[in-house]
């Protein structure tokens, strides 16, 4: 059997599991959302022209009803800050509520979590790769690919099929996340 989701925004597509009632209610709300119109970029997060251009281009791409995008930037050009600004713009425009940040190494996960927490202090964060107590209701989740694979394969499903509105994959070229 196969499960497909038809949300009225994007073409129908296969999904791995059924969406929860909360996921479906959020989808219904999203049907009436408008384009991303408030492209105000916080200069304290990103202030370089090429970073702002990247954020604007991604928002225009999403407004054109594309579900996926790829941002390729050289080392040291502020990819994490661009991701933070993008999350900021998308949350202010009510396009995303829950974000998953994936990376191939724990050090990248830790660094991203620290930067997001510092630059978006009003958003709750949780690092799933770390030990200790976890806030599974946090709006920003951070983990390695392998940690998320373990959560997907676990008997006790922590995350529904529609839990994350935005998934950011750092170092995608190294990704083993082929599901």
Describe the function of each predicted region.
Residues 22-28, 131-133, 171-176:
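Short C-terminal domain-edge/linker segments immediately following a structured domain
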């Amino acid at each position: 059997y196969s499960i497909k989701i038809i949300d009225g925004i994007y073409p129908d597509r296969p999904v791995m599991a059924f969406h929860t009632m909360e996921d479906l209610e959020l989808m219904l709300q999203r049907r009436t959302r408008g384009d991303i119109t408030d492209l105000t970029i916080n200069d304290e997060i990103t202030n370089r022209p090429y970073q702002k251009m990247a954020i604007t281009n991604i928002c225009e791409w999403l407004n054109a009803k594309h579900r996926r995008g790829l941002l390729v930037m050289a080392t040291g050009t502020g990819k994490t800050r661009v991701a933070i600004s993008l999350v900021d713009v998308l949350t202010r425009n009510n396009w995303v509520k829950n974000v998953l940040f994936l990376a191939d190494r724990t050090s990248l996960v830790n660094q991203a979590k620290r930067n997001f927490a510092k630059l978006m202090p009003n958003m709750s964060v949780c690092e799933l790769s770390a030990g200790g107590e976890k806030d599974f209701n946090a709006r920003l989740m951070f983990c390695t690919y392998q940690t998320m694979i373990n959560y997907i394969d676990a008997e006790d499903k922590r995350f529904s099929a529609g839990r994350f509105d935005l998934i950011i994959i750092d170092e995608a070229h190294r990704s083993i996340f082929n599901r």
